[in-house]
Design a protein with these regions (language model features):
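Crotonase-fold acyl-CoA enzyme core
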Residues: 1-89, 123, 128-131
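Terminal low-complexity tails and localization/encapsulation signals of metabolic enzymes
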Residues: 131-145
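Active-site-adjacent beta-strand/loop module that shapes the phosphate/pyrophosphate-binding cleft
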Residues: 98
Length: 145
């Protein structure tokens, strides 16, 4: 639950078994789950200690995608390659804006996003990416500058 993007195989099973053991989920289990899925689904999963299968995990937003077992690693590599192909400065700024924004009132979150947007305009990668976009060409490899 600590990952930014979660994918799984179609035979994956998820659950929070702790209450069946007489304890609460620890290490952020209750807090992360409630932020990923609705508080109601989080409570149902935690209170009942029941497992759910991959299609249900996808439906409630616990995972982003489900793949056949044989395709999972390829899908993960393709997703990682797409992220790696993006401008690192922009990816970091986007992650920061999303994570901080979730903890802020909307008006403050919009300001956080605007600052992240503005910070990207100071980079060589932004200039290269924008130039490629306007020329309708593929951007060159980003340099993290």
């Amino acid at each position: 639950m600590s990952c930014d993007i979660r994918i799984c195989a179609e035979n994956a099973v998820f659950g929070q078994p702790e209450v069946g053991l007489g304890i609460t989920p620890g290490f952020g289990g209750t807090q992360r789950l409630a932020r990923l899925v609705s508080p109601g689904y989080a409570k149902q999963l935690v209170y009942t200690a029941k497992n759910i299968k991959a299609p249900e995990a996808l439906r409630i937003g616990l995972v982003n995608a489900v793949y056949p077992q044989a395709e999972l690693m390829g899908a993960a590599k393709k997703l990682a390659a797409a992220i790696a192909d993006a401008a690192p400065i922009a990816v970091r700024a986007s992650k920061k804006a999303i994570n901080e924004g979730l903890e802020q009132p909307m008006d403050v979150a919009i300001e956080t996003e605007a600052k992240a947007f503005g910070s990207c305009f100071e980079s060589e990668d932004q200039r290269a990416g924008m130039k490629a976009f306007l020329s309708k060409e593929k951007h060159p490899p980003y340099q993290n500058r």
